[in-house]
A protein has these predicted regions:
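Short glycine-rich hinge loops at helix-strand junctions in the catalytic core
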Residues: 75
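Short helix-initiation/N-cap motifs at beta->coil->alpha
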Residues: 80-90
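Acidic, divalent-cation-chelating loop motifs in proteins
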Residues: 33
Length: 181
């Protein structure tokens, strides 16, 4: 979050929204709309992705609908599946999904290494994404072990940038919550 100084404003996502580039990548992988139905296919099979969301965070189905509209622009049939959070958690840990949307407190301790390791660390049971990168793991270890706050901060920033560079996850937004008393 921007309230914790771990590079929020300096991180750069090289995978910005680009419909034409997405279409090029799909075509390069052999996906084209051969039957004119608006959905790209390969070997006669439409590209259909199941996208799991839950309603205990009311903004998540709205994000899912926005993504569904964007995916339609590139010819991908994104089917939204609304399930209980427990199902999302089970799917996320198993890796048995096409896409999941989740809203998680990313730095509830003020130290983001725990969060990054739990979801993307190599060999961690809760890493259902399958992401494994030795450099990422080294950066997390450095961010966890160093006594120097500058070294820890830079390690976390570099780990996050590595995630963005490798399109490990799609970060859609960061909600601002106000508490008024």
């Amino acid at each position: 979050p921007p309230s914790i100084d771990y590079g929020f404003n300096q991180l750069r996502d090289p995978n910005k929204y680009n419909v034409e580039r997405a279409k090029e990548l799909l075509k390069r992988e052999g996906y084209e709309d051969t039957n004119g139905d608006g959905i790209v296919d390969k070997d006669g099979e439409n590209l259909v992705l199941d996208f799991y969301a839950y309603t205990t965070r009311p903004e998540l189905p709205l994000y899912a609908e926005a993504l569904q509209a964007d995916y339609k622009k590139i010819g991908v049939d994104l089917r939204i599946k609304i399930v209980d959070y427990a199902v999302i958690d089970t799917l996320a840990q198993s890796g048995d999904y096409d896409m999941i949307i989740s809203s998680i407190v990313t730095a509830n301790t003020g130290q983001p290494v725990w969060f990054l390791k739990q979801y993307w660390g190599t060999g961690v049971e809760t890493n259902g994404s399958g992401f494994s990168n030795p450099r990422f793991d080294e950066l997390l270890a450095l961010g966890e072990s160093s006594n120097d706050p500058v070294v820890r901060r830079n390690a976390v920033i570099n780990a996050q940038q590595l995630m963005l560079d490798n399109a490990v996850a799609l970060f859609l937004g960061y909600p601002k919550i106000n508490i008024v008393g």
